[in-house]
Amino acid sequence: MTRLPILLLLISLVYATPFPQTSKKIGDDATLSCNRNNTNDYVVMSAWYKEPNSIILLAAKSDVLYFDNYTKDKISYDSPYDDLVTTITIKSLTARDAGTYVCAFFMTSTTNDTDKVDYEEYSTELIVNTDSESTIDIILSGSTHSPETSSEKPEDIDNFNCSSVFEIATPEPITDNVEDHTDTVTYTSDSINTVSASSGESTTDETPEPITDKEEDHTVTDTVSYTTVSTSSGIVTTKSTTDDADLYDTYNDNDTVPPTTVGGSTTSISNYKTKDFVEIFGITALIILSAVAIFCITYYIYNKRSRKYKTENKV
């Protein structure tokens, strides 16, 4: 009576043993293999199928026969000449490839001339993970992820004011002390002088006096004058810029000639110089010489052909 409980315990341990598991990620390749225990008998055929009722392949040496829409492009048989191991590789894993795969060996005895066939099968569970890291990689690396813990009580967290963490600092207004320093620059408006050559009238637009701001006992003055002369050939505008240094030198120079006023005079400006006329004459002469050369060459060719034609007619 004591043997029965022990036998039941052994049977329960055998059937309670989990299958070997292989965990892979989607898109990877999974290699499954089985080793047979009976190494004395002769292997007639090996087979692979997927539970519950899906036959994958039957293999006898290098001859492989696929079933249930499986192909060698999806599942390859990798041990055609090995009698001890049968191996397959499932390529480009998808979620549908997960499940329990069973390998089977069909063997006959090499010593007896009987037709008895022995049978061995082994199961392997394939897990296809959708995460970026597979379970087997986590186990092999030995890394564990523990959740973060907090020593604060829930009521402390509820009463905690989040606004105390993020304080918005209001910047102080930026004031500029006007009394301490003042940066100013004095500008003098342009003085535009327009002289009409045809009518002989001269008009001058004068601007208000410059505004001077004292800071370091110096004044920066830039004077820009424009003079527009209207002539029969067009309008000529000249620009002259005078700074403080030039004014100072002009004031101290005894040889400075005061400006003169133009009135009632007609100004004629020539845009062409002697050099320009020489270039135009040279280009014209070159064109004429080229035309004469072309004419001479044409006349010579025509005259030569005419003589040749006359000679042929005489003959």
Curated annotation (Swiss-Prot):
Ig-like V-type domain ranges (all copies): 17-121
Protein family (similarity comment): Belongs to the orthopoxvirus OPG185 family.
InterPro entries cross-referenced by the UniProt entry: Ig-like_dom (IPR007110), Ig-like_dom_sf (IPR036179), Ig-like_fold (IPR013783), Ig_sub (IPR003599), Ig_V-set (IPR013106)
Induction of its expression: Expressed in the early phase of the viral replicative cycle.
Region (Disordered) residue spans: 193-213
Record's bilayer topology term: Single-pass type I membrane protein
One Pfam family of this chain: V-set
Intravirion side: 304-315
Gene label: OPG185
Signal peptide start-end: 1-16
Disulfide partners: 34-103
CC terms in the record's Gene Ontology section: host cell membrane; membrane; viral envelope; virion membrane
Virion surface face residues: 17-279
Glycosylation sites: 37, 69, 112, 161, 254
PROSITE patterns xrefs: IG_LIKE
Physiological role: Prevents cell to cell fusion by interacting with and directing the viral OPG040 protein on the host plasma membrane. The OPG185-OPG040 complex associates with components of the entry fusion complex (EFC) presumably to avoid superinfection and syncytium formation. Via its interaction with C3/VCP protein, protects the infected cell and probably also the extracellular enveloped virus from complement attack.
Natural source organism: Vaccinia virus (strain IHD-J) (VACV)
Protein's recorded name: Protein OPG185
Keywords: Disulfide bond, Early protein, Glycoprotein, Hemagglutinin, Host membrane, Immunoglobulin domain, Late protein, Membrane, Signal, Transmembrane, Transmembrane helix, Viral envelope protein, Virion
Membrane-traversing stretches: 280-303
Superkingdom to which the source organism belongs: Viruses
